[in-house]
Amino acid sequence: MKLEGIYSALLTPFSEDESIDRQAIGALVDFQVRLGIDGVYVGGSSGEAMLQSLDERADYLSDVAAAASGRLTLIAHVGTIATRDALRLSQHAAKSGYQAISAIPPFYYDFSRPEVMAHYRELADVSALPLIVYNFPARTSGFTLPELVELLSHPNIIGIKHTSSDMFQLERIRHAVPDAIVYNGYDEMCLAGFAMGAQGAIGTTYNFMGDLFVALRDCAAAGRIEEARRLQAMANRVIQVLIKVGVMPGSKALLGIMGLPGGPSRRPFRKVEEADLAALREAVAPVLAWRESTSRKSM
């Protein structure tokens, strides 16, 4: 089973009433396949999972797996505050045909380090699927290198989703545990992550620019660094506008610009305005031109 590679942190399409648009899931998953990415990471931050009930999250895991129908590698994010809820989602992911699970640390309460470590050990012990630890210090308690090394010593913990700008720590993880899979988590630092040893990347903007990041990965692997830097800069121009607009609603708006259903984000995320759409269209135009040029060359 190949778990390395480029994964979109799959968005969740909503209808105008903020219910999950189940009719749109197939089109979104089909687009991920056409982008040529390796898989999808379902139910994470980009999917607005923390704005959903457990039943909604479980249903979405099932719907995405059915739509993918074996065409993509599937990683289910099952992270929650409560260990029992993460275990429930983990069991559901296994039944739905996922290849791995991932989990952010328990948050909101000031859990002790032993409590956080015990949470992961129990999840890894019980899960029928391999576990990828989600290291996201900007949103939850981060991990020290010794803590990550300890977690990765568990036979069912196979990797780290490193959503951090700390490239020193990323490289030290790769050095300390060479067999672990390390996924870069910040899209705007994808090339840096690969340069420091990441074997994969999981990102929000891969939902609509996954083909660009596949090309970036291939250029980096082939030593074509200037070309990879050019692709990273092209992506970063889009990301810079997304940060101003709001990454979640802006990303869904970009799906709409590309003719795909995304819908709004759930409140309290704001609605995208016309001025935002104009800025997003301008920013993504070079990516669309690159895609068209690349498509012509491959014909």
Curated annotation (Swiss-Prot):
One GO CC annotation: cytosol
Catalytic activity from the UniProt record: aceneuramate = aldehydo-N-acetyl-D-mannosamine + pyruvate
Transport in keyword set: no
Entry EC number(s): 4.1.3.3
Pfam families given in the database record: DHDPS
Involved pathway(s): Amino-sugar metabolism; N-acetylneuraminate degradation; D-fructose 6-phosphate from N-acetylneuraminate: step 1/5
Example GO biological process: N-acetylneuraminate catabolic process
Positions of aceneuramate binding: 45-46, 163, 185, 187-188
GO molecular function: N-acetylneuraminate lyase activity
Localization in the cell: Cytoplasm
Xref: PROSITE patterns: DHDPS_2 (PS00666)
Active site: 134 (proton donor), 161 (schiff-base intermediate with substrate)
Keywords: Carbohydrate metabolism, Cytoplasm, Lyase, Plasmid, Schiff base
SMART domains per UniProt: DHDPS
Family membership noted in the UniProt record: Belongs to the DapA family. NanA subfamily.
Subunit structure and binding partners: Homotetramer.
NCBIfam families associated with the record: PRK04147.1
Function: Catalyzes the reversible aldol cleavage of N-acetylneuraminic acid (sialic acid; Neu5Ac) to form pyruvate and N-acetylmannosamine (ManNAc) via a Schiff base intermediate.
Protein name: N-acetylneuraminate lyase
